[in-house]
Amino acid sequence: MKKLLIKLVAVVIIIFSFTGCYALSKKYSYKVNPSDNSSNFSKYMGIYGALTDSYDKDSPIESVSIYPINFSNKKTSEKVELLSNKIKVVYKGKEYYLKTAKNKRSILPYEEGIILKEGAIVYFGKVKVDDKMIIEIPPIRLKKFVHVTSYNPIADGLNIDTTKDVYEGPLDEYKGR
C-alpha cells in the first residue's frame, strides 16, 4: 500500500510539472513598423535595432539595420543599401556621426563606443532599393519592442516544444508581468 501511494504521488508530481510549470521569456529589440511612419519607405524596407543583450531591457543598442521586405509587385525586395558613408544620430541633445558597416545596411554604435538607448533619432538619408530606385528615409525614432513567450522548462529539457507566443509589440503597451 505504501509503495502504491509513493508511485501515485510521483505520478501526480510529474503531471503537475509537465502541465503547470511555465516560465516567461522576454526578448527586447527596437523596430519601426509601417504603421509607425506615414512615409513611403515602409513598403520596401524595415528597420531593426539589436541590443547588446536582447534579454536585458536596459541594454544599449548594438546595431541598427535596414532590411528588405515586400516589393510593390509582391516580390521580395532583395537588396537595400545605405548611400551615405556616415549616418547622423541624435541622442540626448548630442549629435553623433556613425560609419556605415561594410554590408552597407547597418550602423554599429556600440562598436564605435557610443551608448544609445530609447529616444535616439536616426537620420539614414537616401537608400537604394534593388538597384532600381532611391528612397529618402525621414528621421526615425526607434521604438522598443518586446517579444514574450511562455514555455515549460521541464518539458523543454526533454525536447518537447511547449513554447507559446504571449505578446509581441511595443514595450509601453505590454501589460504583463
Language-model segments: which ranges?
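Short, surface-exposed binding/anchoring microloops in extracellular/periplasmic proteins
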Residues: I47-I87
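Short, isolated positions in well-ordered beta-strands
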Residues: S39, G49-T52, Y96, I134
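Short beta-strand elements
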Residues: K132-R177
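Short, solvent-exposed, Trp/other aromatic-anchored flexible loops in extracytoplasmic proteins
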Residues: G93-T149
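Intrinsically disordered, low-complexity segments enriched in glycine and mixed charged residues
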Residues: V89-Y91
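Bacterial Sec signal peptide processing site at the extreme N-terminus
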Residues: S17-S38
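Sec-dependent bacterial lipoprotein signal peptides
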Residues: M1-L24
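N-terminal topogenic membrane-targeting module
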Residues: D36-G46
